[in-house]
From Swiss-Prot:
Assembly behavior: Component of the mitochondrial 39S ribosomal subunit.
Protein's recorded name: Large ribosomal subunit protein mL62
E.C. no: 3.1.1.29
GO process annotations (BP): mitochondrial translational termination
Function in brief: Essential peptidyl-tRNA hydrolase component of the mitochondrial large ribosomal subunit. Acts as a codon-independent translation release factor that has lost all stop codon specificity and directs the termination of translation in mitochondrion, possibly in case of abortive elongation. May be involved in the hydrolysis of peptidyl-tRNAs that have been prematurely terminated and thus in the recycling of stalled mitochondrial ribosomes.
Length: 206
């Protein structure tokens, strides 16, 4: 390996040895590429999350989080986080990114009573013995995104339970009646065939 400093001795002058000024050996220059020309992977954070601008602060809970969720009172929800089994690699073993949101459905005054009753029927498998509706999300490695997904699920449930069935038109009602009559006619035909088969078996045994 060549030394970085070259110290050659010069000729002796006036009874003393003179040293030449140190010379730095040439090194490979590192040229920085122009802005916008550097290589970026398709999986870089700037491309996966263009709004983050390379910073994790974009996924932190903002100070005005309650103002952006006026339709769902966060103070009436029980929010907790735990280990996630979703995407994130080693990150899932270090942070609690899985979000769990629960609230007591029967006493949620911010939801209309008919809507609550319909939600209790439609989502009875998500209600525990205490009457709490439990929602979880682990679609992301960030807590705030999983919390936002749980809140969106609540909005979707409320919107689905708030829909009123449309009154069928005369044509649809007539078609529905014809289908029911055909189903009953086919059911009776199969019963008569089955009864005739059983009667034939009893005659053969006698």
């Amino acid at each position: 390996m060549a030394t970085a400093w070259c110290l050659p001795w010069t000729l002796r002058r006036a009874g003393a040895w003179l040293l030449t000024p140190p010379l730095r050996c040439p090194r490979r220059a590192l040229h920085k590429q122009a802005d916008g020309t550097e290589f970026q992977s398709i999986y870089s954070l700037d491309k996966l999350y263009p709004e983050s601008r390379g910073s994790d602060t974009a996924w932190k809970v903002p100070d005005d989080a309650q103002q952006t969720n006026k339709d769902i009172p966060l103070d009436r929800l029980t929010i907790s986080y735990c280990r996630s089994s979703g995407p994130g690699g080693q990150n899932v073993n270090k942070v609690n990114s899985k979000a769990e949101v629960r609230f007591h459905l029967a006493t949620a005054e911010w939801i209309a009573e008919p809507v609550r009753q319909k939600m209790a029927i439609m989502h009875k498998n998500k209600i525990n013995r205490s009457g709490e509706l439990i929602l979880t999300s682990e679609c992301s490695r960030y807590q705030f995104r999983n919390l936002a997904d749980c809140l969106q699920k609540i909005r979707d449930m409320i919107a689905e339970a708030s829909q009123t069935p449309k009154e069928p038109s005369k044509e649809d009602a007539a078609l529905h009646r014809i289908r029911i009559e055909n189903m009953n006619r086919e059911r009776l035909r199969k019963k008569r065939i089955h009864s005739a088969i059983k009667t034939g078996r009893r005659v053969d045994m006698d």
